[in-house]
């Protein structure tokens, strides 16, 4: 009986950590490839979201958004700011500091947001 319990415990230790790591990895990728279409990408490293807003909508609270070398883009014709209401880290995928270009009326941080190795740029003079 003891041997059976020990074997079950060893199997649980060996098999469970990969499952836990897969569930807890909440990283979403974005890289602007052109156009205003969000139809490209699914948020993985191999197929990042084209638009930053899609990555922001997909990332869970406490997660990370990785920005590719080509940067990220937020485009809008309205006069509302970009609102980030999640606890999220926004970081570069590599050692470069890609630019996150924002064409909105500013940025409102409603959550605990950390920017690491990225350049945040407000690029449209038409917004107040």
Feature map (PLM): residue ranges:
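Positively charged n-region of N-terminal signal peptides that target proteins for export
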Residues: 1-5
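Bacterial N-terminal signal peptides
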Residues: 8-18
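Right-handed parallel beta-helix/beta-solenoid
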Residues: 19-54, 71-72
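Acidic glycine-/aspartate-rich tracts in secreted/extracellular proteins
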Residues: 33-40, 62-63, 69-74, 94-97, ...
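Surface-exposed loop/turn positions
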Residues: 63-64, 88
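Predominantly extracellular beta-rich ligand-binding scaffolds that present long acidic/polar faces
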Residues: 79-80, 85
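Right-handed parallel beta-helix/beta-spiral solenoid domain characteristic of secreted/periplasmic
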Residues: 85-128
